Amino acid sequence: MKKLISALLTLALVIAVALSAASCILKIGGGNNGGNNGGNNGGNNGGNGGGGNNGGSTEPPDTENYIYLVKDGAAEFQFITGGNLDPLVYSAFTTMKEYFSELGIETTRAEDYKSGSVSDCEILLGDNLMFRENCAVDVHTVGDLGYVIKTVGDRVVIVPGSPDIAATAVNKLLSALEVRDDGKTVRVPRSLSETVHTEYELKSIALSGYDISLWSLYAAPSDNDVRALATAFRDTLYKSAGAWLEFADKPGDYVISFTAATEEETGGYGFLVSISGKKITIGCSVSSLFAETYSEFMNEVFLSGAESVSLPDGYSWSRDVTKLYYSDFGAVGDGVTDDFLAIKAAHARANQTGQRVYATPGATYYIGAHPDSISVKTDTVWTGAEFIFDDRGIDSANSSRNYEVFKIESDYASATISDIGSLRAGQKNIGVSLGYPALVYLRWSGAKKYIRYGANQDNGQDTQEIILVDADGNVDPSTPILWDYDVITQAVAYRADVKGITLTGGTVTTRANAADVTNYYRRGIAVYRSNTVITGVKHYITDEGNTGAPYMGFFGVYNSTNVEINSCVMTGHKVYNSGTYDTYSSLSNDVRWVDCVQSQSTTSQAFRNQRVAWGVHASNYSKNLSMTGCTLSRFDAHKGCWNATIKDSTIGIGITIIGGGDLVIENVTRYGSVFLTLREDYGATWDGDIHIKNCRLENAGSTAYVIQANYVLSNGTGHWFGYKCTLAKSISVDGFTVASTSSSPKIYVLSPVVRGAASTYDPSTDTVNPYTLPTSVTVRNVTGGTVSLTNSSCNAIKNIPYKKEQ
């Protein structure tokens, strides 16, 4: 038994020695690629490595010729990348990480060495600070489809020319790695170095005689859109020619400057590339078309397929991007084809891009009935073109009658103001800061104003007006709050457009409707935008028959401030059942009619008596209206005007107005026996001062009135108009001539004034609806007849303080 046990122990010892020897032989044999006889480079090095002491250790690392990324199954390195990786670069990084994960190796990544720890051994992927500061490799020299793989110290650098090539470069590195010891060792030769350059069709670029490599780029850092284009320019040149341009801090020599230029700076073209010595400018005045036109330039100049591009000093490339034409969108302009949709499409495009819109000179654009309007938000030029607005088929049931043909609109949507509690007349601030200047509409439904008297008597309208406020809610002194608002039923802010626009030229003929109704038609050009000018537009009317609906006004202004209608031709409409107008303003401020004329006679008595044409002008709820240098049939303010000026004009049918503030009439000729009428149906009121200077009344009869103001009494008091009425605070007449058909006309400054009044009527004792009289009337330099204050029998009127000077 003892012999058997001894024999077994001896056998176990022999087996143990044999296993130990076998293990030593396997370790000396090397890694995956080695084998007993060496094999390839990795196997040779493994096979040739020395054995460990006591036959139990592996070969020593060959750090002179290799970088060891993994030792003893643990990573000796970390990945270094930039912070915001392109998705393609991140995908390439993931490929590497998964490669090591499959070997059972956990790896780490730092997003740049300044935000993490620095290790002695790293794989640098792409552009990052460690790469820039420690690796003498210019990534841009290889082009967008090239790459560099090399070792620098104990770092492996992978530099793709662009994200598109990152995966290719990473796979190339992975194929060069040597994996040994069943994945416990991974190394890469220090001699690894591979550079692949992109082959380009465009091989050279010279600008003003200087190679592209000398140039850099500039775009204002604050202008994101322009800087994005400059970046796109850089990337395009890099991908097409391998030329990389850095950004400069400011414009200067050898700098290509991208700029949002003015139209003048682009020579009127809107887009201009210009080379002057060592400076290049690429500018566009239409920001929305910068990218599109820049692309056209690049395709024509740099991406045409040429092997070389040389742009000399003085070179320029331009495109007129400032305008587009109706014909570009299919408008025919033959006077027969309905061009409404094509014209609408042209303006829709321009409203997006900011371009001017042009009609083709000589074209006639026909526009029929459409329940829609053409929105205009950019300068528009109709010079030399004609339009036909055909209203003949539009009856009262056709909704097209409610639409303007052209609607000049704001760039900003109106905004409801909900946090104003109440307001008082004369209040200086509305208590709300809008952050921008605006025209503000106010309405209170709890009190009625302008309760009309007479043939068209009504129950009045809600208290309402417009005021101009600044960004802090301060009320502009020229548009004071006129009424008390115990409750604000509605308040709307119409932001004042910074950029003004102009509609220029063209002739429009309205073929009038024949509807036998009193419903008003629109069908014109309406301004709903502040800072707008309509100039040189001529409007005529044909096809007026025995019936027809009235028109609101071909030239309309609504909810706007600073609007001018200049050098336009207007036509009075035939009168049927209601007043009908060719120009109109409502709830607007600072509306000016300048050098406008009427196509018909404004002076013929027969013409006026036959009601061939109604007064051409009307307004409601407006402030600071003016008419200068015009020859028109009428200036008319229905529901109030605050401040009005008429100068250097001829007014045929009449000046009829109510309101307040300053009424200035200077160097104006009026035809008829009454120069100025304060409208009886709204209380013959002007709550302010009236100034008349150097004016003339033509074709007067035997009795002429400077001012006609009829305040109607009933049962000893006035009609309630929703407000107390005032003839005027003061009246000044300085220079007034009457040309009469009578040999000895009588001139009265005031008409009888109070209709139905007994001689004893005294406004001061009328405690219900008194008619406040002026505190002074001053007259000087009146010629053409015998002048007196009034022919009224009312003592209160006769006793108005009156001073006559010659």
Residue ranges and their predicted role:
Residues 59-322:
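Solvent-exposed alpha-helical segments and adjacent loops
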Residues 4-23:
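Sec-dependent N-terminal signal peptides of Gram-positive bacterial secreted proteins and lipoproteins
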